[in-house]
């Protein structure tokens, strides 16, 4: 039996169990999951991959998490270096607000962006993607959006737990305000990075610090409490996060270190969204966090925030970060850059 059919059969069995406990639960039959023909060949290759066999395995000691972190950083750094070379982007380490960051500069900075600055908060479920690996999304934005970007290499567990990452993002934002008008800057990130960007808005607002002119929120980890339809509908369909039993949620709870995950600084969908900057949100139809993205978009709109949603066919979680040669990747970042251009002052 093909792997995805086996996964679907497992979900069917689980659905039957749930159905016996709750008459409102629906049983979904096992069925093939074809790869769409109207997406790029690069995205087709990503879509066709099975979920990682070890998706539900994670470390159970601080040493184990640190080893996983080092391995991820080494792999991600190779990816970032190769990507920067292909896309003619320079990456320079520096320090802002006492936090290690990377200054990411395209070879073709747009004239309209000479006084603008973007701050990027990296993905990685709060525990992965640090070091030079943190620059991947910044490199893509610099190359396709023609902006200068600061990639924030925030602290992560087991070296530092909640709210250390948030503190670092806010510290860099406050430092950036010394040289730039808030209206000239935007903050963006994917997954945990998007959640941290939102939490930074809450913290800055509470401290009376000006907010940026725009936000970019990619597949945000906006709700760690498990609420959201796509946690069920896209379970075993998303071949990156795979399911709530996968790596990312335990990693986020490791970062939370016993703190209530319903706190808006960890699940920002429960925060006061009124008065936040205009925001563009990105997801895919197979993303486990599609509902988190859609629900956040609706709550932003209901709070009076100018919010735009873009959803890409067949993409699992944040697959636009996986391949810089895919036309969908370019489109994601060109859309975000265009949104920023409309909302940032020059």
Feature locations, PLM:
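Conserved, well-structured beta-alpha core segment at the onset of a catalytic domain
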Residues: 5, 17, 197
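Bacterial N-terminal signal peptides that target proteins for export
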Residues: 1-9
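Alpha/beta-hydrolase superfamily serine-hydrolase fold, recognizing
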Residues: 24-65, 85-346
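Intrinsically disordered/low-complexity terminal segments and short unstructured peptides
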Residues: 9, 60, 76-78, 89
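Bacterial N-terminal signal peptides
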Residues: 9-19
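Short linear motifs in intrinsically disordered
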Residues: 79-85
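Short, basic/low-complexity N-terminal boundary segments at the transition from targeting/disordered tails
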Residues: 63-78
């Amino acid at each position: 039996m093909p792997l995805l059919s086996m996964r679907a059969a497992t979900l069917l069995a689980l659905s039957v169990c749930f159905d016996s406990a709750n008459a409102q639960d629906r049983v979904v039959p096992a069925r093939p999951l074809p790869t769409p023909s109207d997406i790029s060949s690069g995205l087709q290759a990503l879509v066709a991959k099975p979920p990682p066999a070890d998706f539900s395995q994670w470390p159970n000691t601080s040493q184990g998490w640190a080893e996983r972190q080092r391995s991820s950083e080494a792999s991600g750094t190779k990816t970032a270096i190769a990507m920067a070379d292909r896309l003619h982007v320079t990456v320079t380490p520096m320090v802002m607000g006492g936090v290690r960051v990377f200054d990411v500069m395209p070879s073709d900075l747009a004239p309209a962006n000479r006084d603008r600055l973007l701050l990027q908060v990296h993905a990685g479920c709060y525990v992965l993607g640090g070091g030079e690996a943190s620059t991947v999304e910044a490199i893509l934005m610099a190359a396709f959006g023609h902006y200068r970007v600061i990639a924030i290499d925030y602290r992560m567990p087991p070296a530092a737990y909640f709210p250390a990452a948030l503190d670092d993002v806010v510290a860099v934002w406050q430092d950036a305000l010394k040289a730039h008008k808030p209206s000239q800057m935007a903050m963006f990130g994917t997954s945990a990075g998007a959640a941290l960007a939102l939490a930074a808005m809450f913290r800055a607002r509470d401290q009376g610090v000006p907010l940026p002119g725009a936000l970019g929120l990619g597949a945000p980890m906006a709700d760690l409490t498990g609420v959201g339809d796509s946690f069920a509908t896209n379970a075993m369909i998303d071949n990156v996060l795979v399911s709530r039993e996968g790596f990312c949620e335990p990693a986020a709870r490791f970062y939370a270190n016993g703190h209530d995950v319903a706190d808006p600084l960890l699940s920002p969908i429960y925060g006061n969204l009124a008065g936040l900057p205009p925001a563009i949100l990105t997801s895919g139809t197979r993303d486990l966090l599609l509902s988190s993205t859609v629900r956040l978009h609706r709550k932003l709109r209901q709070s009076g925030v100018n919010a735009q949603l873009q959803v890409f066919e067949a993409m699992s979680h944040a697959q636009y970060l996986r391949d810089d040669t895919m036309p969908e990747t370019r489109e994601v970042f060109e859309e975000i850059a265009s949104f920023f251009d409309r909302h940032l002052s020059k």
